[in-house]
Regions:
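Active-site beta->alpha N-cap acidic-glycine motif
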Residues: 1-92, 96, 100-118, 192
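Structural recognition of the beta-strand scaffold that forms the well-ordered cores
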Residues: 18-22, 51-56, 118-122, 141-146, ...
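Charged helix-capping and loop-helix junction motifs
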Residues: 34-38, 161-165, 193-197
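Basic- and aromatic-lined ligand-binding clefts that recognize polyanionic substrates
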Residues: 111-135
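Short low-complexity, flexible loop/linker segments enriched in glycine and/or proline
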Residues: 34-37, 67-70, 157-160, 225-231
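C-terminal domain-boundary segment and adjacent tail
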Residues: 14, 18, 189-237
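His/Asp/Glu-enriched short active-site or ligand-binding loop at hydrolase and phosphoryl-transfer sites
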Residues: 126-172, 209-220
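Active-site-proximal loop/turn and secondary-structure-junction residues that shape catalytic pockets
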Residues: 24-26, 58-60, 126, 148-151, ...
């Protein structure tokens, strides 16, 4: 979250609305990205018209399916990368996974007063058809990103300098692509956002691009509209 204020200012300055997928991850300042320290930051983004969705509560990675015999409901081997169970492995039912997704969504709504979109992004984009079906059954459709939309802010700055990433994105991004960037990557020595985000937005706009949230994306719009009057099942209390 260390570059979150700068990213928010760049988005505001350039009149760009984004969809933030949030998990309660460790931060260099405060009590986690969905803790009280950052609550006002999230509230301000809601007031600006941004959208929100779940990235799971403890940034929990799917590792594999655990498939039983006939008639046995699928389970999932998972590993949280934040929170008190960081680094451990568990076998979860579909209901437990839904609760993990729903907990982040519920916290975002409690902080911002705005209902998050009925979407989620699995950490690392790691899923299986069974996991996607389980999440969809409790009201959440998965959102990945476009190949050209992987902006590279989590890659090594030695191998992938900012100038290279900017040039590649401006060359390859196509209409309808979903772009992926983070609110801070500790491991990258040369921070991406201060050097790339605004030139990327300006450059794409000069090519005739506009920016919208996932609420307006044709791949997800019908799903969101169908779910808007429903409360996703299995939310954590």
């Amino acid at each position: 979250m260390e570059v979150a204020p700068l990213m928010a200012e760049i988005l505001r300055k350039n009149q760009v609305k984004a969809t933030f997928f949030a998990a309660n991850e460790r931060t260099q300042t405060g009590d986690g990205s969905l803790g009280t320290h950052w609550a006002d930051w999230w509230k301000a983004r809601a007031a600006e018209g941004h959208e929100f969705a779940s990235h799971t509560w403890d940034h929990t990675y799917w590792r594999s399916d655990v498939v039983g015999g006939p008639g046995v409901a699928p389970q999932f081997r998972v590993s949280p990368s934040a929170g008190p169970s960081e680094g451990r492995e568990f076998i979860w039912t579909a209901q437990q996974y839904c609760e993990e997704v729903g907990r982040a969504s519920a916290r975002l709504q409690a902080i911002t007063g705005k209902k998050p979109l009925p979407l989620f992004r699995a950490p690392g984009g790691k899923t299986s058809p069974r996991l996607l079906a389980a999440a969809k059954a409790c009201g959440y459709q998965h959102v990945g990103w476009s190949p050209a939309g992987f902006l590279g802010d989590e890659l090594s700055s030695d191998r992938y300098p900012n100038a290279f990433l900017l040039k590649k994105a401006l060359r390859d991004i196509q209409p309808g692509d979903i772009l992926l960037a983070h609110l801070g990557i500790w491991s990258r020595k040369d921070p991406w956002s201060p050097a790339v985000l605004e030139p990327l937005i300006v450059g794409l706009k000069s090519r005739g691009f506009c920016f919208q949230t996932l609420r307006e994306h044709p791949q997800y719009k019908a799903w969101i509209e169908a779910q808007v009057s429903r409360t996703p099942a299995k939310l954590a209390k």
